[in-house]
C-alpha cells in the first residue's frame, strides 16, 4: 500500500516543521537569550523540526488517520487553549500567560496529532516529546510554572500507547525479550513514571497556593 503523505498531510508536516523551527530560532535563540542553555533547547526543537522534514522528504507517512484514540487526541488538541485559561486562573497576566504557541503547548498538540493519526508513529519523535515532558516537569519546580503539569500528565498514557503500537508492529518478528514481556515492562515503566509525576505534584502543592 502506498504510504506516501497526501497533499493535506504534507501541509501538516510543513506546518509542524515550521512551528518547531520557529520555537528553536525565534522563541529560544532570539528572545530566550536570558535563559540558561537556551542554545541547547533551540537545538532540541530544531532536531524535532528536522524529523518532520525528514518524514516529508522520504515520504514516511507517520500521520495516517486510523480513528484510534480519538477522544484522548481531541482532549490534547484542546490543551493549547486550556493552557492560557489555566494561567489566567492562576492570576497571571500578559506576558506571563502561557500561550498556545509556547513549547509545552505545541508539544501537547503534537502528541494529540500523533495519537489521532497513529498508523505509523515516528518513535524518535515520540521519544523527543517524552523527554520534553520531563523537562517541562522540572520547570514546575525551578520556574514556578504549574501549567506544565498538563504536559506531564498527558505524556504517561501517550507514552504507553506509542510504545504499545510499536511493540505490536514488531509482534511477528523474533525479539528478546518477547513482545509480551516488553508490554509488561512498558506497563511497569508507565506506572513508575506516573507515580513519580503524582509524587512531584503532591510535593509541590504549596507551589500552586503561592503562585
Residue ranges of model-derived segments:
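Single conserved hydrophobic/aromatic residue that forms the stacking wall/gate
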Residues: 2-13
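Helix-loop junctions on the outward
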Residues: 11, 22-41
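Central hydrophobic cores of alpha-helical transmembrane segments
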Residues: 14-21, 123-135
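Juxtamembrane "helix-exit" motif on the non-cytosolic side of transmembrane helices
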Residues: 25-33, 83-93, 136-146, 199-207
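Membrane-helix boundary connector in multi-pass membrane proteins
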Residues: 30-34, 116-125, 134-147, 167-176
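Membrane-proximal helix-loop-helix units in multi-pass membrane proteins
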Residues: 34-111
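Loop-to-transmembrane alpha-helix initiation sites
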Residues: 37-41, 142-157
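Internal/C-terminal transmembrane anchor helices
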Residues: 177-202
